[in-house]
């Protein structure tokens, strides 16, 4: 009968009755990165059968935008929020209101230990370690590392993994081979230029993400040190990394698994009187995706 009358349920009335809007907020640094876009896609896919839709808010690496995002989403009466922190975020007190309202808050990828909430992360120490070990196994010995100046746990852990791999292989940690700056194509070009102008030039460079790695490759091409002559590896396995020249070796951070785990965790939390009962902290293992930029045998 309802179908014949072209009836559709009033979602506002349903929300008022149930206390739930079936809307989820997701805050990410940027949807331009395939990594975050893939996570969002899998969150949406994992929630649609339960009747949830997603509002996306980009922080663009700004803590001010992130604060506004939390406020905006709470005003929209979302049932919960999932977030990956901006590079600028140190104080996470703006997320406390979500917990105070007894709404699910899940942090993924970039997290902060001050927030006692469920998390889904990569083993970033291992990510830094296996990126370095991969280069060592391919014959590179003087390995540099370009990372962010911001004190974000995932990037700190990767740097520590890099240092541990060097030490385990009896290779020195050379401070001038560690560049702190931004994470972008421009920053990759700048960092590679600085490294290759130094007295102790590296024979391989680990870039903080795949965008930075593109900048590194561009600079190396300009000075006729095209990879894999100088090895380059990034992080995130962005969609473009398989199609640039030379194509880019990278660390796969398993974005689809992160998104699926976020959706599954949310559905578990939303059906509990206290969503923070039996909190989970899921840690995924990274893997190396080897391509031309570290494959000396292809030369």
Language-model features, listed with the residues they occupy:
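N-terminal helix-turn-helix DNA-binding module of bacterial transcription factors
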Residues: 1-22, 295-298
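Conserved hydrophobic residues forming the short capping helix/wall of the S-adenosyl-L-methionine
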Residues: 2, 47, 165-166, 196, ...
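Alpha-helical recognition/docking segments in bacterial nutrient-uptake
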Residues: 18-133, 137, 195-197, 201, ...
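Hinge/beta->alpha junction and helix N-cap segments in small-molecule ligand-binding domains
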Residues: 29-38, 56-65, 85-87, 110, ...
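Short helix-capping segments at alpha-helix termini
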Residues: 49-50, 101, 166-173, 198-201, ...
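Short acidic capping loops at alpha-helix termini that bridge into adjacent secondary structure
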Residues: 142, 173-177, 226-232
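Flexible loop/turn connectors
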Residues: 193-299
């Amino acid at each position: 009968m309802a179908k014949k009358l072209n009836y559709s349920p009033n979602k506002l009335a349903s929300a008022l009755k149930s206390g739930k809007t079936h809307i989820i907020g997701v805050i990410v640094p940027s949807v331009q990165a395939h990594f975050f876009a893939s996570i969002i896609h899998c969150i949406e896919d994992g929630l649609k059968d339960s009747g949830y839709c997603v509002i996306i808010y980009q922080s663009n690496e700004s803590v001010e935008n992130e604060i506004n995002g939390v406020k905006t989403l709470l005003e929209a009466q979302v049932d919960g929020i999932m977030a990956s922190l901006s590079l600028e975020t140190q104080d996470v007190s703006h997320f406390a209101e979500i917990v105070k309202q007894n709404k699910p808050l899940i942090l993924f990828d970039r997290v902060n230990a001050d927030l006692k909430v469920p998390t889904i992360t990569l083993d970033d120490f291992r990510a830094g370690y296996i990126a370095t070990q991969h280069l060592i196994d391919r014959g590179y010995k003087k390995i540099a590392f370009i990372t962010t100046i911001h004190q974000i746990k995932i990037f700190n852990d990767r740097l520590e993994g890099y240092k541990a791999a060097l030490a385990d292989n009896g290779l020195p940690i050379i401070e001038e081979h560690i560049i702190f700056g931004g994470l972008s194509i421009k920053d990759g070009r700048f960092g590679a230029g600085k490294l290759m102008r130094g007295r102790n030039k590296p024979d391989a460079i680990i870039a903080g993400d795949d965008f930075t790695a593109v900048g590194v490759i561009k600079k190396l091409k300009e000075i006729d040190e095209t990879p894999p002559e100088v090895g380059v590896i990034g992080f995130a396995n962005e969609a473009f990394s398989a199609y640039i020249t030379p194509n880019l070796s990278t660390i796969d951070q398993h974005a689809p698994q992160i998104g699926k785990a976020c959706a599954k965790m949310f559905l578990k939390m939303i059906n509990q009187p206290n969503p923070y009962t039996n909190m989970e902290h899921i840690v995924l293992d990274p893997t190396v995706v080897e391509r031309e930029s570290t494959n000396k045998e292809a030369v």
